[in-house]
Amino acid sequence: MSRISSLQDPFLNALRKEKVNVSVYLVNGIKLQGQVEAFDQFCIVLRNTVNQMVYKHAISTIVPAKSVRMVYSSFNPYHQNSNDEQDENVDDIHSDDLEIQENEGNIHE
């Protein structure tokens, strides 16, 4: 698993499971809104009145409408664990802008 997917996949999965409304900003400035229906290493399916498949390379930012509770592995190099535990960590992700980068992973439905 790559470093990026150790943060990206749990974030998208939490949005999907909790059916959180999100605003997705594309690199060309267009704003899409909906819920994350599914995702894989290359795209995200957004559900609103219709389903839209959006390629991740076109996404600049994903902003959740509410805080999201996220679970991820502790080997994440971007997370500092004060206890240096090798178990799962839980963080709250707030509606702050989060940049999405390409990753490797399987489809999540």
From Swiss-Prot:
Statement: the UniProt record of this protein carries the keyword Lipoprotein: no
Assigned GO CC terms: cytosol
Keywords in alphabetical order: RNA-binding, Stress response
Highest taxon above the source species: Bacteria
Annotated stretches, region: Disordered: 77-109
Gene3D superfamilies for the chain: 2.30.30.100
InterPro entries: Hfq, LSM_dom_sf, Sm
Domain Sm: 9-68
Subunit structure: Homohexamer.
NCBIfam families per UniProt: Hfq (TIGR02383), PRK00395.1 (NF001602)
Protein name (database record): RNA-binding protein Hfq
Provenance organism: Francisella tularensis subsp. mediasiatica (strain FSC147)
Phylogenetic classification of the source organism: Bacteria, Pseudomonadati, Pseudomonadota, Gammaproteobacteria, Thiotrichales
Gene that this sequence comes from: hfq
